């Protein structure tokens, strides 16, 4: 299950990365510039690049179609000539205004007051596009028509071929802009899901690591079951392998099942906080019966050969004997062996003696006088 969660987290991370990259790429590909589609009297079309203003109304989604009229005066810093009266009610007119001499908001406001539905402001001696803005709040509240900015070369082409006088018309195509919630909400949902999955993965891994560490450590009740020996001169142990200090009379030594002894103050923290193995031979400290099932995994891991595996592990007899029991068991074994030999000798002697004993069989024959006649037949 943990492996599947890890694979899930890996997939979620990859999906999160891919979607993030694609989202930013999509946002970068979103056009920030609108277009002007111009048609002449022969219905030949040409596209010009423009930049919408930061004030006024937005262009309608289907675009704004109208006839292009040159502003008079060209800078539109004062009231300009309105569109033709005869076509004012039936058609939409867009005015072309030159930059400079006054603020952009003044130019667009004069175009609106003259009756135009949109305004196109062009640059002078440059084809750079400028984002038109305004700092006058009072004027901004009065502007209702959309406006765009174009370069000088685009303005010259529009004047030459696509004006109302030459039978042309233009269409102001709005920029492709999506509402913020269209891409922000899905992005936040994806980020939230990824964060939740990451938190679940981290919690699962924390619980798993904690369980593994607890399983590989010795509990205090298990530690109390290990024998403690007070050191006396003449004991076979002389130096603690952890602190490298010589044992002194009265020192409390913790005897492990592998017969290695250490200071209690040195080995107890190792067993309860690090790992329940002997620091020298890496043999596992035998747990209680209740922990045999829970320690199966850890015992399998420790049985694997690694760089910490001792070259000469203690024998099976050493694992089950405590400190000071080796000599006693050896002497007891020798005594039992001698007893067994004496018994074997006695049995052998008795068997030989039995073989030498002659078996006697008694044959009884009846005599004519009725008295039995006993003949002894010796058989070997």
Curated annotation (Swiss-Prot):
Residues 35-182 are lumenal. Residues 1-34 form the signal peptide. It is found in: Endoplasmic reticulum membrane; Late endosome membrane; Lysosome membrane; Nucleus inner membrane. Residues 285-380 are annotated as: Disordered. Residues 338-356 have a biased composition (Acidic residues). SMART domains: RING. Its EC number is 2.3.2.27. Pathway: Protein modification; protein ubiquitination. The keyword Zinc-finger applies. The chain crosses the membrane at residues 183-203. SUPFAM superfamilies: PA domain, RING/U-box. This is E3 ubiquitin-protein ligase RNF13. The gene is Rnf13.
